[in-house]
Swiss-Prot record:
Any Gene Ontology biological process: conversion of seryl-tRNAsec to selenocys-tRNAsec
Main location: cytoplasm
Catalytic activity, as annotated: L-seryl-tRNA(Sec) + selenophosphate + H(+) = L-selenocysteinyl-tRNA(Sec) + phosphate
Cross-referenced HAMAP family: SelA
Any GO MF annotation of the entry: L-seryl-tRNA(Sec) selenium transferase activity
Alphabetical list of InterPro entries matching this protein: PyrdxlP-dep_Trfase, PyrdxlP-dep_Trfase_major, SelA-like, SelA_trans, SelA_trans_N_dom
Lineage: Bacteria, Pseudomonadati, Pseudomonadota, Alphaproteobacteria, Hyphomonadales
Domain of life, source organism: Bacteria
Organism: Hyphomonas neptunium (strain ATCC 15444)
Gene3D superfamilies in the record: 3.90.1150.180, Type I PLP-dependent aspartate aminotransferase-like (Major domain)
Name of this protein: L-seryl-tRNA(Sec) selenium transferase
Keyword field: Cytoplasm, Protein biosynthesis, Pyridoxal phosphate, Selenium, Transferase
């Protein structure tokens, strides 16, 4: 091994070979050097692992081709459009909500041009970026005032820091949630400078538990919608109206972290456990916090809505600037919110809601069309099967939607190998493996995805 490593050529020597001359004509010296350095490192690892008993020919066409492939790989963007065939509508790893065309157009306009982000066009003086969406949020939720920050965790942190720093926050033991990435609500409360007071039991908490824990140091009663898990069986949780009455009597603030946050009723589509934001505020909750890129169907952001006096105090807090929403997300959010107003039907215009409400007959027709196009392209083992799709994004874990899927077997590739190859295709196709078949749930596809899927299979299965 040591003898082989001693014979590895120097980088400068390789760059001077005739084999590299053609690459240096097409690419910069820095690009070629970086790719060569990576190739040499791979050879070194192979020797050290005992996988190589001789060095490759560094001037061969195969080695040069590998270096060129490395250069091209470095030139490709890391963040690419992908096709979500998982059956999970709001897939966190795939970017959550797909934006509506109107939202994308708004992002393009805001990014390509100067805008009145913080300019009052009527007076010519400095304005507030929040003014572009605050009235819309209030109209759609019934809130007195609203504020938008960069994500829901920031919304919770800001809300608690501005109202409860140095004081107590009371929360039920059954609602001390953990979201993705191991971020836990107790940690957020601690970071806000407040002290957490847990009440009740994991499965049962009553309004009297909150009442007994309130003292002069208590600032906030905090509810959290357990959107990513459910506690069932011998359980009890107080009604929001009970806690709202208690908060009024004791001069405390009732806040609720709704997580996903939905502006419309999903029960007609069999999804019954997601509270509508306007209903939560009507019940007497003072402040709600929810995400913009989940069931709302907009960009990543955290929306805070509720009592005007509390929202004003949040806007004045120093943390507000540190977590403020950027102009592109703001543009996308405004455009998305407008799709909830007449004459628009959000279930037709907002992609997330369209995916949830889409009739299964349409999904089955799309599945048959995809299966037919794959068959025409030469993929012979293709089949349509019933499936179940999920909302995702930490929402409605116990509920699913009737769907249809297309399954594929490629003879020379195992399901795992096929899935890996499709992830490496352009566009990458992300599906599932069930019963030794690669499966694509069609509820999370749109008609425009089908040509990309066929092209990906051409790249992978027919080569």
């Amino acid at each position: 091994m040591g003898n082989l490593l001693r014979h590895l050529p120097q980088l400068d020597a390789l760059l001077s070979t005739a084999a590299m001359a053609s690459l240096l004509e097409r690419y910069s010296r820095e690009e070629v050097a970086d790719a060569l350095r990576a190739a040499l490192q791979e050879v070194r690892k192979g020797v050290q692992a005992g996988h190589m008993d001789s060095l490759p020919d560094f001037e061969s066409a195969g080695f040069v081709s590998g270096v060129m492939a490395g250069i091209e790989a470095r030139r490709r963007p890391n963040l690419v459009a992908a096709i979500n065939a998982t059956g999970i509508i709001i897939h966190t790893n795939l970017g959550r909500a797909r934006l509506a065309p109107e939202a994308m157009a708004a992002v393009q306009a805001a990014g390509a041009h100067a805008s009145n982000l913080e300019l009052d066009l009527a007076t010519g003086r400095r304005g507030s970026r929040y003014a572009h969406v605050e009235a819309l949020i209030c109209e759609l939720t019934g809130a007195e005032a609203a504020l938008v920050v960069n994500n829901c965790a920031a919304a919770v942190l800001l809300s608690l820091m501005a109202t409860a720093q140095g004081r107590k926050v009371i929360a039920s033991r059954g609602e001390l949630i953990e979201i993705g990435g191991s971020f836990r609500l107790p940690d957020v409360i601690q970071q806000s400078g407040a002290t957490l007071k847990e009440v009740g039991a994991t499965n049962k908490t009553r309004a009297s538990d909150y009442a007994q824990a309130i003292d002069a140091e208590t600032a906030v009663l905090l509810k959290s919608h357990t959107s990513n898990y459910q506690i069932v069986g011998f359980t009890h949780a107080p009604q929001r109206e009970e806690l709202a009455s208690l908060a009024r009597e004791t001069g405390t603030i009732l806040m609720e972290d709704l997580g996903s946050g939905v502006l419309v009723d999903l029960s007609p589509y069999g999804l019954n456990d997601e509270p509508v934001v306007s209903d939560v505020l009507k019940s007497g909750v003072d402040v709600v916090m929810f995400s913009g890129d989940k069931l709302l169907g907009g960009p990543q952001c955290g929306i805070i809505a509720g009592r005007a006096d509390i929202i004003v105090s949040l806007k004045k807090h120093p943390l507000c600037r540190a977590v403020r929403i950027d102009k592109l997300s703001l543009a996308a959010l405004e455009a998305t919110l407008r799709l909830y107003r007449a004459p628009h039907d959000p279930f037709q215009k907002v992609p997330v809601l369209r995916a949830i409400s889409q009739p299964v007959e349409e999904i089955e027709a799309r599945a048959r069309r995809l299966a037919g196009e794959l068959t025409v392209a030469g993929i012979v083992d293709v089949m349509c099967i019933p499936s179940r799709a999920y909302v995702g994004g930490g929402s409605l874990p116990q509920q699913n939607l009737e769907s249809c899927a297309v399954t594929v077997i490629v003879p020379h590739l195992s399901p795992d190998a096929l899935a890996a190859a499709l992830r490496a295709a352009r566009p990458p196709v992300i599906g599932m493996i069930r019963e030794d078949r690669f499966v694509m749930d069609v509820r999370t596809l749109i008609d425009g995805d089908l040509p990309g899927i066929v092209e990906a299979f051409r790249q992978v299965a027919l080569r």
